[in-house]
Amino acid sequence: MAVGKNKRLTKGKKGTKKKIIDPFTKKDWYDVKAPSMFAVRNIGKTLVTRTQGKKLASDGLKGRVFEVSLADLQNDEQSFRKFRLISEDIQGKNVLTNFHGMTMTTDKLRALVKKWQTLIEANVDVKTTDGYLLRLFCIGFTKRQPNQIKKTSYAKSSQCRSIRKKMVDVMTREVSQIDLKETVNKLIPDSIGKDIEKKCQSIYPLHDVFVRKVKVLKKPKFDIGRLMDLHGESAGGKGATDTFEPPVQESV
């Protein structure tokens, strides 16, 4: 074959190199705001592609889930829970979030499980007064008596059933009579777990009783007024001023 007739040898040599564009030039940073139940409101920043034509930046942000440690939300290094917050609305450069779930850290959960004691778990689906359907998971362990000689502290199966029933009753009673905001306020110090521990003392003494996990199964129809109340008037005010800032800058 004659040299110079091979088309593949010359392919790709024509024209200049493709210009590399940094993808971050098309993106904007937004502040993520936690609801007013938490001590720290500004939990971080998130990145999204800027609005282009019909593709809005707010659509790309809505529905994002942020997992934040309670230690960061409450400035408490002893906390061992992680809260999931979901983005529900955008106000200017602020992303307003709502409660989307809770879990315990894996290291804490593994540290609780020990020999010579009975592990008791229960879960229940409860609907709050404002229409949120939550699934709560509870965990507890039997405790040795102060003057006990026996090495083990195992509960009978009948006692486990009674404790499990008591766990379900307490969780249902505590959550079904309040809204989501008050539920989160109870989950932060875990007052539900402490209440279960007190109620079960007559059946079998327990320790390390926690609501280890909360899932949001169903939500009511989105209401901007309710979300603003959840973030407090100050958050709503800040969002309103941020919304009007960009047009002023453009006119100047």
UniProtKB/Swiss-Prot annotation:
Highest taxon of the lineage: Eukaryota
InterPro entries: Ribosomal_eS1 (IPR001593), Ribosomal_eS1_CS (IPR018281), Ribosomal_eS1_euk (IPR027500)
Biological process according to GO: translation
Gene Ontology, cellular component aspect: cytosolic small ribosomal subunit
Pfam families for the chain: Ribosomal_S3Ae
SMART domains: Ribosomal_S3Ae
Keyword check for Cytoplasm: yes
Predominant location category: cytoplasm
Any one GO molecular function term: structural constituent of ribosome
Compartments where located: Cytoplasm
Coiled coil (residue ranges): none
Keywords from the named record: Cytoplasm, Ribonucleoprotein, Ribosomal protein
Quaternary organization: Component of the small ribosomal subunit. Mature ribosomes consist of a small (40S) and a large (60S) subunit. The 40S subunit contains about 33 different proteins and 1 molecule of RNA (18S). The 60S subunit contains about 49 different proteins and 3 molecules of RNA (28S, 5.8S and 5S).
Family that this chain belongs to: Belongs to the eukaryotic ribosomal protein eS1 family.
Protein name, entry field: Small ribosomal subunit protein eS1
Organism: Suberites domuncula (Sponge)
